[in-house]
UniProtKB/Swiss-Prot annotation:
UniProt membrane topology term: Single-pass type II membrane protein
UniProt source species: Paramagnetospirillum magneticum (strain ATCC 700264 / AMB-1)
Protein encoded by which gene: ccmE
Matches recorded under HAMAP family: CcmE
Residues annotated to bind heme: H121, Y125
Name of the protein in question: Cytochrome c-type biogenesis protein CcmE
Described function: Heme chaperone required for the biogenesis of c-type cytochromes. Transiently binds heme delivered by CcmC and transfers the heme to apo-cytochromes in a process facilitated by CcmF and CcmH.
């Protein structure tokens, strides 16, 4: 093998290794991304089961059912609602009519299996994603929560 061929071989090998490393990094990044959806987005789009995501909205009035450590409730953007099942301890500020962001996966039957529930921290705060979803659906009332 001549010197020129050897150099070309190492350059090609280096480019292949770099391409493989970039592919691994991109795969890791795409696996760790968590997309945000409103209940209307979930109802109007075909969301694949098992995909990790966040849903934001308000806890629908009269929808919270506690059964031991398992809690079932609905997250709504006033236009549509998504049933959520969560097993664990809820945040102290979790209650009906309050803003919430839940992280988890869609499951068969159209319910959302939450692994984490995040509640807003005071009556004036609305998570950015929830506020944008309410504005998009036309339910935003100048920073105040919509009436259900």
């Amino acid at each position: 093998m001549t010197r020129k061929q050897r150099r070309l071989y190492f350059v090609l090998l280096g480019m292949a290794a770099l391409g493989g490393a970039v592919a691994l990094v991109l795969t890791a990044i795409s696996d760790s991304l968590v997309y945000f959806y409103s209940p209307t987005d979930i109802v109007s789009q075909r969301i694949p089961e098992g995909r990790r995501m966040r849903i934001g909205g308000l806890v629908e009035n009269d929808s919270v059912v506690k059964d031991g450590k398992t809690v079932t409730f609905k997250v709504t953007d006033v236009t549509n609602a998504v049933p959520v099942v969560y097993t664990g301890v809820l945040p102290d500020l979790f209650r009906e009519g309050q803003g919430v962001v839940v992280e988890g996966r869609m499951e068969a039957g159209g319910h959302f299996k939450a692994s984490e529930v995040l509640a807003k921290h005071d009556e004036n705060y609305m998570p950015k994603e929830v506020a944008e979803a309410l504005k998009k659906s036309g339910q935003w009332n100048d920073g105040k929560q919509p009436k259900q």
